[in-house]
Structures are given as C-alpha cells and as structure tokens.
Amino acid sequence: MADGSGARFPRFSELCAKYAAQLAAAETRSVYAFSARPITGGEPVSLGFLRGRVLLIENVASLUGSTVREYTQMNELQRRLGARGLVVLGFPCNQFGHQENAQNAEILPSLKHVRPGNGFEPNFMLFEKCEVNGARAHPLFAFLREALPAPSDDMSTLVSDPQLIAWSPVCRNDVAWNFEKFLVGADGTPVRRYSHRCQTLAVEPDIEALLPPPARGYYA
C-alpha cells in the first residue's frame, strides 16, 4: 500500500512479523526462553508462564549444612510475598560435595522426613536435578551465569577447594556452592546474584523493591 507520494506503507502481516521477531529477540535475553521439568515429573514447563512475576532462583541440596535454614527461608519468602508476585524456584544439584545424591523421586521424602524434616513440604516450585556448571549445565543456569557473572555480595566467590570441582570446563562465572541465588525481574531479566553466604531472607529488601506495593489491608 502507498500514500499519495508513492511511499509504501508496510503490510499488517509485515508489522506482525517484525513484532514477533522483536519479541523472540527479547525472549533470548530473558528466562522466558527456558523450560524445566518439575520434581514430580511430567512434561517440561516453560518459564514463560511466569511472565510478570519476580523470580528468586536457587540451586539447592538436601544434605548441605545450610539445607534446613535455606529451605525454611525459601518457604517463608514464598509465604510472605507470593501473593504480591514472587515465585521461588529451586533446582536440586549434586555438583557441590555430592550433597544432592538422591534420585528425583527421593528428594521430596528426604525433605519431609530428614532435612528439614518434621513434615516439611516446599511451598515453592521445585524442579528435577540438574547441573549448573560445566558442559552439561542446564541452559537456564548457563544464561544466568552469563548475565550475572559474579555474586553482588562477594565478587571474589570461588570454589574454595579445587578438589571439589567435578565439572569441565571451569569458568570464572561458575556457581561456587549450594544455595546461590539469582533474582529476576518481572520482565524476565536477571537483576542480581547472591553468594551462598547470603541467607535467603536477606534478599527480601531487593525483592520488595521489584514488587508492587502491598494492597490496602495486606498483611504478611
């Protein structure tokens, strides 16, 4: 189609195709391009269904010295801020001291009866075991490490004992231990990374800054 000057207007189909290409390019810079299989099995779930939510992503382990504290705090954060748009995601990983050596089907019973125990059940999204470093790293974690090369609270964090490194290649942006944290904004863009030394609840102020204010009458 052209106007009186002879200039050609783009067809509607061309505009739609251009917009779709722009969306696809944006997806590659966000977590929405990735999927993961729930710990209970079934088909992989696209993280695109979490569009508009603030995400806290952690690599977790059920036999770590921090397991009780971090799992409990992850539950607490989800309870406090879930209604306002926070979604906590946990990815079991056995790359650090072999502290997640159970099969996928054994992890939930272990959490319930051993650590944290006392009937504990995660109220956040837990996915199947994966690797977070090396050639077989889950694509989501490869993306997160590239986007956020070092924890903001400890830029020098590295695996303390080289004998514990059980993956290849080794990269400067590798996750150093269980319970590192990646905060992702509501647009799917990684915002901040935290070391395993940073407790989960310590991230709450940064999460609050990304969430809408509580509705009147809301109580945590």
Curated annotation (Swiss-Prot):
User: Could you describe the post-translational modifications of this protein?
Assistant: During periods of oxidative stress, Sec-64 may react with a superoxide radical, irreversibly lose hydroselenide and be converted to dehydroalanine.
Q: What class of enzyme is it?
A: oxidoreductase
Keyword check for Transcription regulation: no
Listed EC numbers: 1.11.1.9
List the catalytic activities from the record. Answer: 2 glutathione + H2O2 = glutathione disulfide + 2 H2O
Residues marked Subject to oxidation and hydroselenide loss to dehydroalanine (site): 64
Q: Does the keyword Oxidoreductase apply?
A: yes
Which biological process, per GO, is one annotated for this protein?
hydrogen peroxide catabolic process
Q: Which SUPFAM superfamilies match?
A: Thioredoxin-like
Keywords recorded for this protein, A-Z:
Oxidoreductase, Peroxidase, Selenocysteine
The active site lies at 64
Show the InterPro entries listed in the entry.
Glutathione_peroxidase, GPX_AS, GPX_CS, Thioredoxin-like_sf
- Per its UniProt record, what PANTHER family does this chain match? GLUTATHIONE PEROXIDASE, GLUTATHIONE PEROXIDASE 1
What does the UniProt record say this protein does?
May protect the virus and component of infected cells from oxidative damage by peroxides whose formation may be stimulated by infection.
Give the misc comment: This enzyme has been acquitted by lateral transfer from its human host and has retained 74% identity with cellular GPX1.
Annotated protein name in UniProt: Glutathione peroxidase
